[in-house]
């Protein structure tokens, strides 16, 4: 989080706001293993909230890369996605998480989204 805050400070004009929360289907504290994202193995607690709890509007694009937590994130974002109809770019590792991918596809289709394009492990979904 603080790395991104530092990077964002370089830009004098920005429409980006950073919050120190993980996204889920409910408010809770989760244990996170950071060894896949930093050079040394590290663990820590992350406060989680739903995307819907922020009451965001005018969202055009959502990028999701949460390594297996896509289903809780999408379930906690249903209202936001329905009200804003953003383009969704979601990392889906089909070779490693077939059950998660199937559930994500079901949620996205239920919300009126249609698969558009795949590049490596990222997929683009648009409101149909």
Where are these regions (language model features)?
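Phosphate/nucleotide-binding beta-alpha loop and adjacent structural elements of enzyme active sites
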Residues: 1-128
């Amino acid at each position: 989080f603080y790395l991104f805050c530092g990077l964002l400070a370089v830009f004098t004009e920005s429409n980006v706001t950073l919050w120190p929360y993980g996204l889920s289907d409910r408010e809770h504290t989760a244990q996170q293993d950071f060894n896949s994202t930093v050079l040394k193995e590290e663990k820590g607690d992350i406060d989680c909230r739903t995307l819907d709890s922020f009451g965001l509007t005018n969202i055009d694009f959502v990028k999701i890369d949460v390594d297996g937590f896509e289903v809780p994130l999408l379930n906690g974002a249903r209202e936001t996605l329905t009200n804003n109809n953003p383009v969704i770019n979601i990392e889906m590792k089909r070779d490693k998480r077939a059950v998660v991918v199937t559930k994500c596809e079901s949620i996205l289709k239920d919300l009126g989204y249609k698969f558009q394009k795949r590049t490596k492990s990222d997929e683009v979904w648009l409101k149909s």
